């Protein structure tokens, strides 16, 4: 490390003080250093020191646009407490001073201090405003002339030579300074330490990478002396209090890894690899919410960095509103609630140090994080609706004005002299206003910004068309709009969004003729077939977003005048085909959009899910133009472009980071030149294409992190990829013809995930067994693979899966050193014994050996103390398991079905008594069917092995015979329950199942479910699954009065019924009380039922009905309301004609093949949140299908037994 980098902060401060020189002598000092290095902190220290002497100090944060003298002197006056920034309830006009008056007051205030010298600090110079701007253009230099010696201290990130100034370069912290910053967090770091971390720390220390085997020493090393990295991490750890397993894993990967791995991490996670900082990266990763939590935190994070880059610092309230405008909190039912969510995120950012506050409630991000790169995300434009921060650009004349949240609306702080200029409201709030009159009020006539979420009145367009001063108009999710012609007169618009208006089928061709200032246009979710050609003339247009316009058949010609475009996003325009025009034949094509080379500012291009058959050309060179490259384009997204046949010359895209053509099933050609000059390409995804080969130039994409070729069924051989030394993920699963992968993997030291499943490989790639950092090796269903090499060097391997490799007979070497393994799946292989020393892997969590028919015995597994899942189902020759499982306290699932075991291993008491544990014994000779009622005695009396004798009476309640099947049918079944299966009513005796809460009834001869419940004395059933019961014509027929006497509140919450041919009713007319608390109902293949309920089940939240041939209506009432129903799925109900209820709070709705169900004016209306398109043949185009495809939480399922 250079000597300069070891300069202490105290030494730098001394240099600065020396450079200021003697009193009475003007001077200029410039502090230069990267973002987050501490320049502003040093400036504050200097200001404190000189203030104690004879100095006045003035600060100017130049990370905001200062465009006029008035703004400049208002900033200075606020510092001197002459004026104050407005707060809620204040009227800004009362605080307003004329410019000359402001200057005089500033002078008077400075004279009061009786200090002869002045230090002017220009912080973050050049980010939004320059020194020249304020000193010369805004005449600050003249204003300060009466000070004979003005000393100027400038901080900036870039280094440039200047005359008559002293430049001091600020380097990293010294080791002692870093430790001082970390000192207060020592106890916190100790509390986060995992049990295996001390071993890793010792290894790093032994290798001389850190001085002491502590987390502090590790963070010190990885932080590279960047104070911002240390501060943000410590604040983040304090904020989260505890880390999830996923966060601990990331911590371990980023902080407890060898420095030799940082280069690959930099390639993946940093824009400028030389400035990659693992500690900053960790702080970002800790920001990500749990996968089950859908908060827009990450979108907001990337927005604040983009905002600062283009608009500078922001007033905190404005920043939250910008997040709302970008759609991060959609759907917005209440502006108040959306704002509160944004405020919560903003405070979290501040608590973590990601946002910092300046004077006047202005906030700035920790800009050192702007070097981060998250290729897993869709990018700023991929998640934003407007890109409004780029339109605004820090110019307060183009912003939102001074706004306030009041009465569930955001509006301008209203003064006595001026009208409201900004209104942001939801449809729910506007319902309280008189329709058609709200925007005609006198105080609304100067409106410049109008943002409406889900408005619901018809006169909207007419009212808005009269507001001629509008700059920003956003109408989001308004189904009632079918015509916007009158809005064409709003000539001053900079931003226009009309999205989610599924009834809008046409926009006049001349609509945009006079909107010459338009910069952002979002027409997503419309039913338009053609985009107005006058868009071509919008020379200031930056954002063109038409996502999910499924009827769109053409585009404007972007090469006419729209040269400033930064994003073109037409994702989901499924009818856009041919050549971006409505022509059907090449001879009719006139060259529209043939070449995009003139769009030199384009960053994001998304053609996903369109039917385009070609891409535009990206280079142009003629007598007047030389556009040989498009250096700004970073994302080219072509997912599911099913008619795209070839990739053209992509060489001009020199800074492309992501090329994604996954699902372009007709893609058959990729030119060699496509991958030339791709030094910045990080992700290449050609999955599910028809490419017969991969271009040889792949070898030159040296910084590639992910190579994804899943399900490329025609590729037989891959060219050498051994030069891709930064590769981390390599996936060729499903390439069924792939026989050979050329080149050696020996130098791919960063590779951590390899998937070779379902390929035709007979051996693994050369030297793949030497990759010590490999974490996942997945080789499922490689039917030609007979042997594997010695895997002893894969010391970081965590997942090893060779299931379905039916010819695999041998795995060489020992697993003794693979201490990180936590999942091993050897199912359906030809192995006669387990790999050597696998029984020594104390961290193993899953051992899955399904259908290993040659496996006769297992080694002693007592050391697998962390085992969670143990599955040997279908191992027909397995007749013995050595020793006891009693020490496996984490054990959750044991599947012994279909084995030849005669005895059962002793299970841990803590495990088997936990309500979330399952034992599957079906088709196992451990226990005979007629012995279920004496299961404890049966196991105890066996002459060999252990018994359940030590686990107590509750054991019997935790045994699962067949109910596991319902996890496959219905993935919303929670993980932490056991389903007791009653295939015949005599299988289990009453005493063992009376307390069951979840029960399945299959192929049972009983006439009703209630008779079974009575027979088995089951009074606390919460979930019931019923199928293939041929005699049942009614489910529940017990008397309602008797039910009420048994329980004041019935327990049944979930009911799933299928294949009941005689069922005509869910309950008799006197038995409906049992459904009082029902939340979820699924009815499938019940051909005789005509209606579901005579009364409204008030607590129903989810309803799915399909394949019921005689079902005429859902509810046998004239009209009712299911206020709690969130999800409705109706499929193939040929005579259903009436719903019979209103669903005001419906969130997801799918109605398919219900030909008689026609929307009528007198039909109770589905809630406004849903656009309920009913179709005979097609699913709703804007809804998600049955929730079985997207469960609310992941569920584990073993094979059906």
From Swiss-Prot:
<feature type="repeat" description="LRR 5">
    <location>
        <begin position="680"/>
        <end position="701"/>
    </location>
</feature>
<dbReference type="InterPro" id="IPR032675">
    <property type="entry name" value="LRR_dom_sf"/>
</dbReference>
<feature type="repeat" description="LRR 8">
    <location>
        <begin position="750"/>
        <end position="771"/>
    </location>
</feature>
<comment type="function">
    <text>Potential disease resistance protein.</text>
</comment>
<comment type="similarity">
    <text>Belongs to the disease resistance NB-LRR family.</text>
</comment>
<feature type="repeat" description="LRR 9">
    <location>
        <begin position="773"/>
        <end position="795"/>
    </location>
</feature>
<feature type="repeat" description="LRR 14">
    <location>
        <begin position="890"/>
        <end position="911"/>
    </location>
</feature>
<protein>
    <recommendedName>
        <fullName>Putative disease resistance protein At4g19050</fullName>
    </recommendedName>
</protein>
<feature type="repeat" description="LRR 6">
    <location>
        <begin position="703"/>
        <end position="725"/>
    </location>
</feature>
<feature type="repeat" description="LRR 1">
    <location>
        <begin position="469"/>
        <end position="491"/>
    </location>
</feature>
<feature type="compositionally biased region" description="Polar residues">
    <location>
        <begin position="1185"/>
        <end position="1201"/>
    </location>
</feature>
<keyword id="KW-0067">ATP-binding</keyword>
<feature type="compositionally biased region" description="Basic and acidic residues">
    <location>
        <begin position="1162"/>
        <end position="1180"/>
    </location>
</feature>
<keyword id="KW-0677">Repeat</keyword>
<feature type="repeat" description="LRR 10">
    <location>
        <begin position="796"/>
        <end position="818"/>
    </location>
</feature>
<dbReference type="GO" id="GO:0006952">
    <property type="term" value="P:defense response"/>
</dbReference>
<feature type="repeat" description="LRR 11">
    <location>
        <begin position="820"/>
        <end position="841"/>
    </location>
</feature>
<feature type="repeat" description="LRR 7">
    <location>
        <begin position="726"/>
        <end position="748"/>
    </location>
</feature>
<feature type="repeat" description="LRR 13">
    <location>
        <begin position="866"/>
        <end position="888"/>
    </location>
</feature>
<feature type="region of interest" description="Disordered">
    <location>
        <begin position="1162"/>
        <end position="1201"/>
    </location>
</feature>
<feature type="repeat" description="LRR 12">
    <location>
        <begin position="843"/>
        <end position="865"/>
    </location>
</feature>
<feature type="binding site">
    <location>
        <begin position="33"/>
        <end position="40"/>
    </location>
    <ligand>
        <name>ATP</name>
    </ligand>
</feature>
<keyword id="KW-0433">Leucine-rich repeat</keyword>
<dbReference type="InterPro" id="IPR027417">
    <property type="entry name" value="P-loop_NTPase"/>
</dbReference>
<dbReference type="GO" id="GO:0005524">
    <property type="term" value="F:ATP binding"/>
</dbReference>
<dbReference type="GO" id="GO:0043531">
    <property type="term" value="F:ADP binding"/>
</dbReference>
<feature type="repeat" description="LRR 4">
    <location>
        <begin position="540"/>
        <end position="562"/>
    </location>
</feature>
<dbReference type="Pfam" id="PF00931">
    <property type="entry name" value="NB-ARC"/>
</dbReference>
<keyword id="KW-0547">Nucleotide-binding</keyword>
<feature type="repeat" description="LRR 3">
    <location>
        <begin position="517"/>
        <end position="539"/>
    </location>
</feature>
<dbReference type="Pfam" id="PF23247">
    <property type="entry name" value="LRR_RPS2"/>
</dbReference>
<keyword id="KW-0611">Plant defense</keyword>
<dbReference type="InterPro" id="IPR002182">
    <property type="entry name" value="NB-ARC"/>
</dbReference>
<feature type="repeat" description="LRR 2">
    <location>
        <begin position="492"/>
        <end position="514"/>
    </location>
</feature>
């Amino acid at each position: 490390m250079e000597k300069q980098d070891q300069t202490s902060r105290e030494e730098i401060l001394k240099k600065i003080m020396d450079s200021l020189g003697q009193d009475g002598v003007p001077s200029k000092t410039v502090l230069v250093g990267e973002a987050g290095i501490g320049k502003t902190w040093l400036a504050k220290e200097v200001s404190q020191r000189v203030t104690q002497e004879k100095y006045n100090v003035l600060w100017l944060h130049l990370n905001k646009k200062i465009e006029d003298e008035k703004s400049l002197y208002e900033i200075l006056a606020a510092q001197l407490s002459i004026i104050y920034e407005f707060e809620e309830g204040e009227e800004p006009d009362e605080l307003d001073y004329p410019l000359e008056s402001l200057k005089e007051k500033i002078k008077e205030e400075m004279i009061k201090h009786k200090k002869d010298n002045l230090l002017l600090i220009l912080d973050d110079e050049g980010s939004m405003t320059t020194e020249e701007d304020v000193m010369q253009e805004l005449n600050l230099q003249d204003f300060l002339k009466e000070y004979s010696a003005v000393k100027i201290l400038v901080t900036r990130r870039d280094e440039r030579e200047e005359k008559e100034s002293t430049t001091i370069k600020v380097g990293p912290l010294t080791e002692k300074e870093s430790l001082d910053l970390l000192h207060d967090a020592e106890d916190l770091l100790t509390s986060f330490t995992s049990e295996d971390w001390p071993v890793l720390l010792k290894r790093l220390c032994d290798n001389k990478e850190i001085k002491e085997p502590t987390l502090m020493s590790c963070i010190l090393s990885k932080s590279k002396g960047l104070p911002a990295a240390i501060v943000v991490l410590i604040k983040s750890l304090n904020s989260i209090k505890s880390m999830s397993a996923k966060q601990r894993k990331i911590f371990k990967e980023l902080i407890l890894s060898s420095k030799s791995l940082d280069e690959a991490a930099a390639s993946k996670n940093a824009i400028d690899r030389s400035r990659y900082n693992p500690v900053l990266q960790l702080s970002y990763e800790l920001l990500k919410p749990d996968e089950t939590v859908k908060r827009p935190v990450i979108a907001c994070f990337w927005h604040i960095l983009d905002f600062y880059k283009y608009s500078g610092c922001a007033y905190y309230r404005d920043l939250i509103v910008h997040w709302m405008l970008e759609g991060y909190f959609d759907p917005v039912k209440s502006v108040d609630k959306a704002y509160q969510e944004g405020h919560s995120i903003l405070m979290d950012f501040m608590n973590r140090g990601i946002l910092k506050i300046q004077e006047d409630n202005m906030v700035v991000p920790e800009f050192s994080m702007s070097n981060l790169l998250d290729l897993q995300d869709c990018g700023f434009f991929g998640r934003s609706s407007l890109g409004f921060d780029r339109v605004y650009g820090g110019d307060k004349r183009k912003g939102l004005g001074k706004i306030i949240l009041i009465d569930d609306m955001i509006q301008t702080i209203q003064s006595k002299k001026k009208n409201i200029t900004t209104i942001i409201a939801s449809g729910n709030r506007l319902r309280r206003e008189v329709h058609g009159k709200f925007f005609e009020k006198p105080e609304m006539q100067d409106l410049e910004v109008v943002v409406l979420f889900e408005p619901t009145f018809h006169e909207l367009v007419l009212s808005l068309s009269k507001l001629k001063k509008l700059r920003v108009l956003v109408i989001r999710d308004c189904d009632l709009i079918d015509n916007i012609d009158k809005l064409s007169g709003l000539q001053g618009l900079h931003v226009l969004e009309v999205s989610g208006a599924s009834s809008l089928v046409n926009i006049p061709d001349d609509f945009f003729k006079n909107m010459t200032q338009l910069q952002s246009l979002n027409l997503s979710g419309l039913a338009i077939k053609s985009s107005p050609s006058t868009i071509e003339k919008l020379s200031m247009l930056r954002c063109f977003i038409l996502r999910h316009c499924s009827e769109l058949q053409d585009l404007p010609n972007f090469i006419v005048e729209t040269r400033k475009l930064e994003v073109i996003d037409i994702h989901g325009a499924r009818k856009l085909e041919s050549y971006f025009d409505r022509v059907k034949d090449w001879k009719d094509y006139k060259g529209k959009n043939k070449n995009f080379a003139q769009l030199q500012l384009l960053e994001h291009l998304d053609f996903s899910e369109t039917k385009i058959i070609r891409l535009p050309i990206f280079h142009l060179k003629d007598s007047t133009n030389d556009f040989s490259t498009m250096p700004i384009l970073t994302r080219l997204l072509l997912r599911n472009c099913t008619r795209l046949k070839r990739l053209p010359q992509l060489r001009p895209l020199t800074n492309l980071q992501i090329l994604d053509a996954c699902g372009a099933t007709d893609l058959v050609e990729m030119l060699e030149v496509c991958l030339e000059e791709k030094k910045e390409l990080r992700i290449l995804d050609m999955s599910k294409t028809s490419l017969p080969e991969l271009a040889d130039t792949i070898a030159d994409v040296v910084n590639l992190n992910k190579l994804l070729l899943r399900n490329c069924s025609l590729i037989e051989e891959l060219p050498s990829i051994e030069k891709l030394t930064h590769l981390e993920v390599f996936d060729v699963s499903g390439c069924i013809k792939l026989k050979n992968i050329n080149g050696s993997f020996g130098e791919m030291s960063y590779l951590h995930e390899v998937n070779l499943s379902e390929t035709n490989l007979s051996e693994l790639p050369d030297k793949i067994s030497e990759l010590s950092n490999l974490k996942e090796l997945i080789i499922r269903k490689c039917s030609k693979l007979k042997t594997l090499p010695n895997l002893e060097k894969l010391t970081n391997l965590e997942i090893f899966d060779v299931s379905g490799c039916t010819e695999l007979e041998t795995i060489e070497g020992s697993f003794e050193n693979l201490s990180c393994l936590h999942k091993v799946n050897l199912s359906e292989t030809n192995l006669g014994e387990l790999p050597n020393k696998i029984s020594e892997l104390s961290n193993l969590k899953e051992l899955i050996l399904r259908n290993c028919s040659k496996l006769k015995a297992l080694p002693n597994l007592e050391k697998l103390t962390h085992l969670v899942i143990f599955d040997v189902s279908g191992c027909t020759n397995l007749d013995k398991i050595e020793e006891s499982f009693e020490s496996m306290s984490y054990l959750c699932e044991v599947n012994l079905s279909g084995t030849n075991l005669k005895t059962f291993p002793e299970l841990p008491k803590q495990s088997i008594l936990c309500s979330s544990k399952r034992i599957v014994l079906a088709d196992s000779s451990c226990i005979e069917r007629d012995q279920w009622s004496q299961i404890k005695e049966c196991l105890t009396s066996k002459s060999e092995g252990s018994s359940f004798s030590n686990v107590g009476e509750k054991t019997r309640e935790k045994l699962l015979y067949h109910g596991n099947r319902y996890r496959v049918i219905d993935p919303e079944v929670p993980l932490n329950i056991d389903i007791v299966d009653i295939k015949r009513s005599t299988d289990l005796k009453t005493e063992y199942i009376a307390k069951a809460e979840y029960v399945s009834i299959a192929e049972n001869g009983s006439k009703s479910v209630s008779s079974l419940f009575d027979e088995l004395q089951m009074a606390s059933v919460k979930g019931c699954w019923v199928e293939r019961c041929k005699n049942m014509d009614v489910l529940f027929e017990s008397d309602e009065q008797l039910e009420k006497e048994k329980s004041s509140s019935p327990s049944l919450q979930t009911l799933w019924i299928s294949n009941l041919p005689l069922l005509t009713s869910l309950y008799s007319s006197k038995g409906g009380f049992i459904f009082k608390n029902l939340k979820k109902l699924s009815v499938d293949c019940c051909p005789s039922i005509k209606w579901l309920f005579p009364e409204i089940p008030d607590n129903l939240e989810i309803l799915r009905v399909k394949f019921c041939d005689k079902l005429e209506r859902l509810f046998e009432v004239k009209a009712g309301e299911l206020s709690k129903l969130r999800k409705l799925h109706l499929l193939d109900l040929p005579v259903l004609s009436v719903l019979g209820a209103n669903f005001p709070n419906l969130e997801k709705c799918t109605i398919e093949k219900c030909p008689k169900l026609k929307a009528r004016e007198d039909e109770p209306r589905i809630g406004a949140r849903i656009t309920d398109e009913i179709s005979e043949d097609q699913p709703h185009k804007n809804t998600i299908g049955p929730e079985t495809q997207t469960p609310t939480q992941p569920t584990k399922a073993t094979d059906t037994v």
